[in-house]
Amino acid sequence: MFLSVFDVFKIGVGPSSSHTMGPMSAANRFLELVLSNEWPRPSSNVQVASIKVSLHGSLAHTGIGHGTGRAVILGLMGERPDTVDPDRMDAIIDEVEHSGRITPPGHPGYQFHPKTDLIFDKKVPLPGHANGMSFSAFDKDERLLVKRIYYSVGGGFVVTDTELEQMRADKKKPAAAGERVPFPFASAKQMLDMSERSGLSIAQMKRANEETRMSPEELDAGLDRIWAAMSSCIDRGLKVDGIMPGGLKVRRRARAIHDKLQEEWRSNRINPVLANDWLSVYAMAVNEENAAGGRVVTAPTNGAAGVIPATIRYYQHFHEDWDQEGIHNYLLTAAAVGGIIKHNASISGAEVGCQGEVGSAAAMAAAGLAAVMGATPEQIENAAEIALEHHLGMTCDPIAGLVQVPCIERNALGAVKAVTAASLALKGDGQHFVPLDACIETMRQTGHDMSEKYKETSTGGLAVNVVEC
Protein backbone atom coordinates (compact mmCIF):
# COMPACT_ATOMS: atom_id res chain seq x y z
CA MET A 1 0.00 0.00 0.00
CA PHE A 2 1.43 3.36 -1.02
CA LEU A 3 -0.17 6.72 -0.31
CA SER A 4 2.07 9.68 -1.04
CA VAL A 5 2.85 12.27 1.60
CA PHE A 6 1.42 14.78 -0.90
CA ASP A 7 -1.88 12.89 -0.98
CA VAL A 8 -2.10 13.05 2.80
CA PHE A 9 -1.06 16.72 2.98
CA LYS A 10 -2.78 18.76 0.26
CA ILE A 11 -2.86 22.54 0.02
CA GLY A 12 -6.41 23.83 -0.42
CA VAL A 13 -9.09 26.03 1.08
CA GLY A 14 -11.51 25.71 3.98
CA PRO A 15 -13.73 24.95 5.61
CA SER A 16 -13.81 21.21 4.81
CA SER A 17 -11.65 18.80 2.84
CA SER A 18 -14.53 16.38 2.26
CA HIS A 19 -17.30 18.96 1.83
CA THR A 20 -15.37 21.79 0.12
CA MET A 21 -12.16 20.57 -1.52
CA GLY A 22 -13.65 17.22 -2.55
CA PRO A 23 -16.73 18.64 -4.33
CA MET A 24 -14.58 21.29 -6.03
CA SER A 25 -12.29 18.54 -7.34
CA ALA A 26 -15.30 16.45 -8.42
CA ALA A 27 -16.57 19.41 -10.44
CA ASN A 28 -13.11 19.71 -12.03
CA ARG A 29 -13.22 16.05 -13.00
CA PHE A 30 -16.68 16.39 -14.51
CA LEU A 31 -15.56 19.35 -16.62
CA GLU A 32 -12.68 17.24 -17.94
CA LEU A 33 -15.14 14.45 -18.75
CA VAL A 34 -17.45 16.81 -20.65
CA LEU A 35 -14.58 17.83 -22.95
CA SER A 36 -13.32 14.26 -23.41
CA ASN A 37 -14.46 11.50 -25.72
CA GLU A 38 -15.10 9.13 -22.83
CA TRP A 39 -18.88 9.20 -23.21
CA PRO A 40 -21.09 8.26 -26.18
CA ARG A 41 -22.36 11.23 -28.19
CA PRO A 42 -25.67 10.77 -30.08
CA SER A 43 -24.13 12.66 -33.00
CA SER A 44 -21.11 14.83 -33.65
CA ASN A 45 -23.09 18.07 -33.56
CA VAL A 46 -24.70 17.42 -30.17
CA GLN A 47 -23.24 19.74 -27.55
CA VAL A 48 -23.59 20.10 -23.80
CA ALA A 49 -25.84 23.07 -23.03
CA SER A 50 -26.47 22.79 -19.29
CA ILE A 51 -25.23 21.07 -16.15
CA LYS A 52 -27.08 19.99 -13.02
CA VAL A 53 -25.68 18.76 -9.70
CA SER A 54 -27.27 16.97 -6.76
CA LEU A 55 -25.66 16.51 -3.34
CA HIS A 56 -26.57 13.60 -1.08
CA GLY A 57 -26.05 12.25 2.43
CA SER A 58 -23.80 14.31 4.65
CA LEU A 59 -23.08 16.72 1.77
CA ALA A 60 -26.79 17.55 1.64
CA HIS A 61 -27.26 17.79 5.41
CA THR A 62 -24.27 20.00 6.23
CA GLY A 63 -23.30 21.28 2.79
CA ILE A 64 -24.59 24.80 3.29
CA GLY A 65 -22.54 25.28 6.46
CA HIS A 66 -19.51 23.64 4.85
CA GLY A 67 -19.71 25.75 1.69
CA THR A 68 -20.29 22.70 -0.52
CA GLY A 69 -22.51 24.53 -2.98
CA ARG A 70 -19.96 27.31 -3.28
CA ALA A 71 -17.23 24.74 -3.87
CA VAL A 72 -19.21 23.08 -6.67
CA ILE A 73 -19.76 26.44 -8.39
CA LEU A 74 -16.07 27.31 -8.10
CA GLY A 75 -15.08 23.90 -9.42
CA LEU A 76 -17.44 24.23 -12.38
CA MET A 77 -15.81 27.58 -13.12
CA GLY A 78 -12.48 25.77 -13.40
CA GLU A 79 -11.09 26.78 -10.01
CA ARG A 80 -8.99 24.20 -8.15
CA PRO A 81 -8.53 23.82 -4.39
CA ASP A 82 -4.78 24.38 -4.45
CA THR A 83 -4.81 27.45 -6.72
CA VAL A 84 -8.11 29.26 -6.14
CA ASP A 85 -7.68 32.75 -4.71
CA PRO A 86 -9.73 32.94 -1.48
CA ASP A 87 -10.13 36.69 -2.00
CA ARG A 88 -11.83 36.18 -5.40
CA MET A 89 -14.21 33.36 -4.50
CA ASP A 90 -17.18 35.58 -3.62
CA ALA A 91 -16.88 37.52 -6.88
CA ILE A 92 -16.77 34.32 -8.96
CA ILE A 93 -19.87 32.94 -7.23
CA ASP A 94 -21.73 36.24 -7.62
CA GLU A 95 -20.97 36.17 -11.34
CA VAL A 96 -22.53 32.72 -11.74
CA GLU A 97 -25.57 33.56 -9.62
CA HIS A 98 -26.29 36.70 -11.65
CA SER A 99 -25.62 35.25 -15.11
CA GLY A 100 -26.99 31.72 -14.67
CA ARG A 101 -24.00 30.41 -16.61
CA ILE A 102 -20.69 28.76 -15.88
CA THR A 103 -17.79 29.76 -18.12
CA PRO A 104 -14.75 27.63 -17.27
CA PRO A 105 -11.58 28.25 -19.32
CA GLY A 106 -11.50 26.15 -22.49
CA HIS A 107 -15.26 25.53 -22.47
CA PRO A 108 -18.02 27.23 -24.48
CA GLY A 109 -20.04 27.98 -21.34
CA TYR A 110 -23.06 26.15 -19.95
CA GLN A 111 -26.36 27.07 -18.37
CA PHE A 112 -26.26 26.63 -14.61
CA HIS A 113 -28.66 28.35 -12.21
CA PRO A 114 -27.48 27.54 -8.66
CA LYS A 115 -30.96 27.91 -7.15
CA THR A 116 -32.50 25.28 -9.45
CA ASP A 117 -29.57 23.28 -10.82
CA LEU A 118 -27.76 22.63 -7.53
CA ILE A 119 -29.92 20.37 -5.35
CA PHE A 120 -29.33 19.44 -1.70
CA ASP A 121 -31.16 16.09 -1.61
CA LYS A 122 -31.49 15.09 2.05
CA LYS A 123 -33.91 12.24 1.34
CA VAL A 124 -32.01 9.94 -1.02
CA PRO A 125 -28.45 8.96 -0.02
CA LEU A 126 -26.20 7.41 -2.63
CA PRO A 127 -25.15 3.83 -1.83
CA GLY A 128 -21.36 4.03 -1.91
CA HIS A 129 -20.50 6.60 0.75
CA ALA A 130 -22.08 9.25 2.96
CA ASN A 131 -20.55 12.02 0.81
CA GLY A 132 -22.16 11.38 -2.56
CA MET A 133 -22.82 13.73 -5.46
CA SER A 134 -24.21 13.39 -8.96
CA PHE A 135 -23.21 15.55 -11.96
CA SER A 136 -25.30 15.51 -15.16
CA ALA A 137 -24.90 17.26 -18.52
CA PHE A 138 -27.78 17.92 -20.92
CA ASP A 139 -28.18 19.17 -24.48
CA LYS A 140 -30.31 22.18 -25.47
CA ASP A 141 -33.43 19.98 -25.52
CA GLU A 142 -32.79 18.80 -21.92
CA ARG A 143 -31.77 15.30 -23.02
CA LEU A 144 -29.28 13.66 -20.67
CA LEU A 145 -25.91 13.25 -22.35
CA VAL A 146 -23.58 12.13 -19.57
CA LYS A 147 -23.87 11.51 -15.83
CA ARG A 148 -21.27 10.65 -13.20
CA ILE A 149 -21.47 9.87 -9.51
CA TYR A 150 -18.57 10.95 -7.32
CA TYR A 151 -17.81 10.31 -3.67
CA SER A 152 -15.73 12.56 -1.45
CA VAL A 153 -14.12 9.98 0.83
CA GLY A 154 -12.23 12.27 3.20
CA GLY A 155 -9.11 14.41 3.13
CA GLY A 156 -10.02 15.89 -0.26
CA PHE A 157 -9.91 12.50 -2.01
CA VAL A 158 -12.58 12.06 -4.72
CA VAL A 159 -13.49 8.84 -6.54
CA THR A 160 -16.19 7.71 -8.96
CA ASP A 161 -18.52 4.91 -7.95
CA THR A 162 -16.45 2.50 -10.06
CA GLU A 163 -13.20 3.68 -8.49
CA LEU A 164 -14.71 3.31 -5.02
CA GLU A 165 -15.54 -0.34 -5.71
CA GLN A 166 -12.00 -0.94 -6.97
CA MET A 167 -10.51 0.83 -3.95
CA ARG A 168 -12.47 -1.41 -1.58
CA ALA A 169 -11.47 -4.50 -3.54
CA ASP A 170 -7.81 -3.49 -3.37
CA LYS A 171 -8.00 -3.27 0.43
CA LYS A 172 -8.81 -6.98 0.53
CA LYS A 173 -5.71 -7.95 -1.45
CA PRO A 174 -2.43 -9.00 0.21
CA ALA A 175 -0.21 -6.01 0.76
CA ALA A 176 3.05 -6.26 -1.01
CA ALA A 177 3.36 -8.13 -4.26
CA GLY A 178 2.45 -5.63 -6.97
CA GLU A 179 3.53 -2.44 -5.26
CA ARG A 180 6.56 -0.81 -6.87
CA VAL A 181 7.91 0.77 -3.74
CA PRO A 182 10.63 -0.72 -1.54
CA PHE A 183 8.52 -0.66 1.65
CA PRO A 184 4.84 -1.36 0.81
CA PHE A 185 3.59 -1.56 4.40
CA ALA A 186 -0.20 -1.59 4.77
CA SER A 187 -0.33 -1.97 8.54
CA ALA A 188 1.61 -0.80 11.57
CA LYS A 189 2.91 -4.32 12.15
CA GLN A 190 4.28 -4.52 8.62
CA MET A 191 5.82 -1.08 9.06
CA LEU A 192 7.64 -2.16 12.22
CA ASP A 193 8.73 -5.47 10.71
CA MET A 194 10.16 -3.74 7.63
CA SER A 195 11.90 -1.18 9.81
CA GLU A 196 13.52 -3.90 11.90
CA ARG A 197 14.67 -5.89 8.85
CA SER A 198 16.01 -2.86 6.99
CA GLY A 199 17.47 -0.98 9.94
CA LEU A 200 15.77 2.17 8.66
CA SER A 201 13.54 4.59 10.51
CA ILE A 202 9.90 5.06 9.52
CA ALA A 203 10.77 8.41 7.94
CA GLN A 204 13.63 6.83 5.96
CA MET A 205 11.36 4.08 4.63
CA LYS A 206 8.69 6.60 3.69
CA ARG A 207 11.33 8.73 1.96
CA ALA A 208 12.55 5.72 -0.02
CA ASN A 209 8.99 5.05 -1.17
CA GLU A 210 8.45 8.67 -2.21
CA GLU A 211 11.74 8.78 -4.10
CA THR A 212 10.46 6.11 -6.50
CA ARG A 213 8.13 8.88 -7.75
CA MET A 214 10.38 11.96 -7.53
CA SER A 215 13.93 13.10 -6.89
CA PRO A 216 15.18 13.80 -3.35
CA GLU A 217 15.29 17.50 -4.22
CA GLU A 218 11.68 17.48 -5.44
CA LEU A 219 10.57 15.66 -2.30
CA ASP A 220 12.32 18.11 0.02
CA ALA A 221 10.97 21.10 -1.91
CA GLY A 222 7.46 19.67 -1.69
CA LEU A 223 7.77 19.10 2.05
CA ASP A 224 9.03 22.66 2.45
CA ARG A 225 5.96 23.94 0.55
CA ILE A 226 3.64 21.96 2.80
CA TRP A 227 5.19 23.32 5.99
CA ALA A 228 5.35 26.85 4.58
CA ALA A 229 1.61 26.72 3.85
CA MET A 230 0.88 25.36 7.33
CA SER A 231 3.09 27.94 9.01
CA SER A 232 1.59 30.81 7.02
CA CYS A 233 -1.87 29.64 8.03
CA ILE A 234 -0.88 29.84 11.71
CA ASP A 235 0.55 33.32 11.24
CA ARG A 236 -2.53 34.60 9.41
CA GLY A 237 -4.81 33.17 12.06
CA LEU A 238 -2.88 34.92 14.82
CA LYS A 239 -3.30 38.32 13.17
CA VAL A 240 -7.03 38.38 12.44
CA ASP A 241 -9.95 38.91 14.79
CA GLY A 242 -13.67 39.51 14.32
CA ILE A 243 -16.69 37.29 13.66
CA MET A 244 -16.39 34.14 11.57
CA PRO A 245 -18.84 33.66 8.67
CA GLY A 246 -21.84 31.35 8.77
CA GLY A 247 -24.36 32.96 11.09
CA LEU A 248 -23.35 31.56 14.48
CA LYS A 249 -21.55 34.82 15.27
CA VAL A 250 -18.61 32.91 16.74
CA ARG A 251 -15.76 35.29 17.44
CA ARG A 252 -12.15 34.52 16.56
CA ARG A 253 -10.09 34.13 19.73
CA ALA A 254 -6.62 33.11 18.60
CA ARG A 255 -5.28 36.64 18.19
CA ALA A 256 -6.39 37.81 21.65
CA ILE A 257 -5.06 34.66 23.33
CA HIS A 258 -1.78 34.99 21.43
CA ASP A 259 -1.40 38.62 22.52
CA LYS A 260 -1.80 37.57 26.17
CA LEU A 261 0.66 34.71 25.79
CA GLN A 262 3.26 37.01 24.29
CA GLU A 263 2.96 39.23 27.36
CA GLU A 264 3.56 36.16 29.55
CA TRP A 265 6.35 34.75 27.38
CA ARG A 266 9.06 34.88 30.01
CA SER A 267 7.04 32.93 32.54
CA ASN A 268 5.98 30.48 29.82
CA ARG A 269 9.62 29.66 29.16
CA ILE A 270 10.12 28.99 32.86
CA ASN A 271 6.96 26.93 33.31
CA PRO A 272 6.71 24.33 30.50
CA VAL A 273 3.14 23.42 31.49
CA LEU A 274 2.04 26.62 29.79
CA ALA A 275 3.28 25.16 26.51
CA ASN A 276 -0.25 23.74 26.28
CA ASP A 277 -1.52 27.29 25.85
CA TRP A 278 0.78 27.83 22.89
CA LEU A 279 -0.21 24.51 21.34
CA SER A 280 -3.86 25.45 21.68
CA VAL A 281 -3.54 28.91 20.20
CA TYR A 282 -1.58 27.63 17.19
CA ALA A 283 -4.22 24.98 16.48
CA MET A 284 -7.08 27.44 16.96
CA ALA A 285 -5.42 29.94 14.61
CA VAL A 286 -5.36 27.34 11.83
CA ASN A 287 -8.94 26.24 12.34
CA GLU A 288 -10.26 29.77 12.56
CA GLU A 289 -8.63 30.40 9.18
CA ASN A 290 -10.17 27.18 7.91
CA ALA A 291 -13.63 28.17 9.17
CA ALA A 292 -13.29 31.46 7.29
CA GLY A 293 -12.51 29.63 4.02
CA GLY A 294 -8.82 30.51 4.03
CA ARG A 295 -5.81 28.64 2.67
CA VAL A 296 -5.09 25.48 4.70
CA VAL A 297 -3.44 22.08 4.35
CA THR A 298 -5.36 18.83 4.82
CA ALA A 299 -3.73 17.13 7.81
CA PRO A 300 -5.29 14.69 7.12
CA THR A 301 -8.52 16.71 6.73
CA ASN A 302 -9.47 20.38 6.94
CA GLY A 303 -11.61 19.83 10.01
CA ALA A 304 -8.50 18.48 11.77
CA ALA A 305 -6.02 20.79 10.03
CA GLY A 306 -4.76 22.50 13.19
CA VAL A 307 -3.30 19.58 15.14
CA ILE A 308 -0.20 18.85 13.07
CA PRO A 309 0.86 22.47 12.35
CA ALA A 310 0.45 23.27 16.06
CA THR A 311 2.71 20.42 17.13
CA ILE A 312 5.35 21.29 14.52
CA ARG A 313 5.38 24.91 15.71
CA TYR A 314 5.64 23.55 19.26
CA TYR A 315 8.65 21.48 18.14
CA GLN A 316 10.25 24.62 16.68
CA HIS A 317 9.68 26.78 19.74
CA PHE A 318 10.30 24.36 22.59
CA HIS A 319 13.10 22.18 21.18
CA GLU A 320 16.35 24.05 20.62
CA ASP A 321 17.78 21.40 18.28
CA TRP A 322 14.98 21.59 15.71
CA ASP A 323 15.94 21.89 12.04
CA GLN A 324 14.33 21.63 8.61
CA GLU A 325 15.34 17.99 8.28
CA GLY A 326 13.44 17.34 11.49
CA ILE A 327 10.30 18.89 9.99
CA HIS A 328 10.74 16.69 6.90
CA ASN A 329 11.05 13.59 9.09
CA TYR A 330 8.03 14.66 11.12
CA LEU A 331 5.86 15.02 8.00
CA LEU A 332 7.08 11.74 6.48
CA THR A 333 6.44 9.82 9.71
CA ALA A 334 3.02 11.40 10.18
CA ALA A 335 2.10 10.60 6.57
CA ALA A 336 3.13 6.97 7.03
CA VAL A 337 0.74 6.62 9.98
CA GLY A 338 -2.00 8.58 8.21
CA GLY A 339 -1.78 6.32 5.18
CA ILE A 340 -2.18 3.22 7.34
CA ILE A 341 -5.25 4.70 9.05
CA LYS A 342 -6.85 5.70 5.75
CA HIS A 343 -6.14 2.31 4.19
CA ASN A 344 -7.54 0.27 7.07
CA ALA A 345 -10.30 2.52 8.42
CA SER A 346 -11.23 6.08 7.43
CA ILE A 347 -10.29 9.72 7.93
CA SER A 348 -13.81 10.90 7.05
CA GLY A 349 -16.07 12.36 9.73
CA ALA A 350 -19.06 11.44 7.59
CA GLU A 351 -17.96 7.80 7.70
CA VAL A 352 -16.61 7.26 11.23
CA GLY A 353 -17.17 10.50 13.15
CA CYS A 354 -14.53 12.88 14.47
CA GLN A 355 -12.41 10.01 15.80
CA GLY A 356 -11.38 9.60 12.14
CA GLU A 357 -10.50 13.28 11.76
CA VAL A 358 -9.05 14.78 14.94
CA GLY A 359 -8.28 11.28 16.24
CA SER A 360 -6.25 10.44 13.14
CA ALA A 361 -4.57 13.86 13.18
CA ALA A 362 -3.54 13.39 16.81
CA ALA A 363 -2.13 9.93 16.06
CA MET A 364 -0.15 11.31 13.12
CA ALA A 365 1.07 14.28 15.16
CA ALA A 366 2.11 12.10 18.08
CA ALA A 367 4.05 9.82 15.73
CA GLY A 368 5.77 12.73 13.98
CA LEU A 369 6.68 14.47 17.21
CA ALA A 370 7.97 11.28 18.81
CA ALA A 371 10.13 10.67 15.74
CA VAL A 372 11.86 14.06 15.89
CA MET A 373 12.37 13.67 19.64
CA GLY A 374 14.44 10.54 19.08
CA ALA A 375 11.87 7.77 19.49
CA THR A 376 12.40 4.26 18.20
CA PRO A 377 9.92 2.91 15.61
CA GLU A 378 8.20 0.97 18.40
CA GLN A 379 7.84 4.11 20.51
CA ILE A 380 6.48 5.99 17.49
CA GLU A 381 3.84 3.31 16.93
CA ASN A 382 3.01 3.46 20.65
CA ALA A 383 2.63 7.25 20.52
CA ALA A 384 0.22 7.03 17.59
CA GLU A 385 -1.82 4.35 19.36
CA ILE A 386 -2.09 6.32 22.62
CA ALA A 387 -3.32 9.40 20.77
CA LEU A 388 -5.87 7.52 18.66
CA GLU A 389 -7.11 5.35 21.53
CA HIS A 390 -8.18 8.38 23.52
CA HIS A 391 -10.26 9.75 20.66
CA LEU A 392 -12.23 6.53 20.07
CA GLY A 393 -15.97 7.14 19.89
CA MET A 394 -15.67 10.87 19.26
CA THR A 395 -18.68 12.14 17.32
CA CYS A 396 -18.86 14.65 14.48
CA ASP A 397 -21.80 16.92 15.35
CA PRO A 398 -20.96 20.44 14.15
CA ILE A 399 -23.49 23.08 15.12
CA ALA A 400 -25.29 24.45 12.03
CA GLY A 401 -23.01 22.30 9.86
CA LEU A 402 -20.22 24.82 10.33
CA VAL A 403 -16.64 23.75 11.03
CA GLN A 404 -16.53 25.98 14.12
CA VAL A 405 -18.17 24.50 17.23
CA PRO A 406 -16.83 22.14 18.54
CA CYS A 407 -14.22 21.78 15.80
CA ILE A 408 -11.88 24.69 16.56
CA GLU A 409 -11.31 23.91 20.24
CA ARG A 410 -11.27 20.20 19.47
CA ASN A 411 -8.14 20.73 17.38
CA ALA A 412 -6.51 22.50 20.32
CA LEU A 413 -7.21 19.55 22.60
CA GLY A 414 -6.10 17.13 19.88
CA ALA A 415 -2.72 18.86 19.74
CA VAL A 416 -2.34 18.71 23.53
CA LYS A 417 -3.22 15.00 23.51
CA ALA A 418 -0.71 14.38 20.71
CA VAL A 419 2.15 15.93 22.68
CA THR A 420 1.12 14.03 25.80
CA ALA A 421 0.97 10.76 23.84
CA ALA A 422 4.44 11.32 22.40
CA SER A 423 5.82 12.11 25.85
CA LEU A 424 4.26 9.01 27.41
CA ALA A 425 5.60 6.80 24.62
CA LEU A 426 9.10 8.23 25.00
CA LYS A 427 9.02 7.34 28.70
CA GLY A 428 8.53 3.68 27.78
CA ASP A 429 10.43 1.17 25.67
CA GLY A 430 7.87 0.74 22.90
CA GLN A 431 6.26 -2.32 24.45
CA HIS A 432 2.57 -1.74 25.11
CA PHE A 433 -0.73 -3.54 25.49
CA VAL A 434 -2.88 -2.30 22.57
CA PRO A 435 -1.31 -2.45 19.08
CA LEU A 436 -1.96 0.48 16.76
CA ASP A 437 -3.52 -1.87 14.21
CA ALA A 438 -6.06 -3.06 16.79
CA CYS A 439 -6.87 0.53 17.69
CA ILE A 440 -7.40 1.45 14.03
CA GLU A 441 -9.70 -1.53 13.55
CA THR A 442 -11.61 -0.54 16.69
CA MET A 443 -12.04 2.95 15.28
CA ARG A 444 -13.37 1.49 12.02
CA GLN A 445 -15.86 -0.77 13.81
CA THR A 446 -16.96 2.01 16.16
CA GLY A 447 -17.56 4.31 13.21
CA HIS A 448 -19.53 1.62 11.41
CA ASP A 449 -21.76 1.14 14.46
CA MET A 450 -22.15 4.87 15.17
CA SER A 451 -25.53 6.41 14.42
CA GLU A 452 -25.65 8.57 11.30
CA LYS A 453 -26.77 11.40 13.60
CA TYR A 454 -23.20 11.65 14.85
CA LYS A 455 -21.42 11.43 11.50
CA GLU A 456 -21.37 14.95 10.06
CA THR A 457 -25.10 15.28 9.46
CA SER A 458 -25.79 17.85 12.22
CA THR A 459 -28.86 15.83 13.24
CA GLY A 460 -27.64 14.80 16.69
CA GLY A 461 -25.38 15.74 19.59
CA LEU A 462 -24.35 19.35 20.03
CA ALA A 463 -25.93 20.23 16.70
CA VAL A 464 -29.44 19.71 18.11
CA ASN A 465 -28.88 20.48 21.79
CA VAL A 466 -27.34 23.93 21.43
CA VAL A 467 -29.59 26.74 20.22
CA GLU A 468 -28.16 28.59 17.22
CA CYS A 469 -28.00 32.31 17.99
Language model features with spans:
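Accessory carbohydrate-recognition regions in carbohydrate-active enzymes
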Residues: 13-60, 128, 159
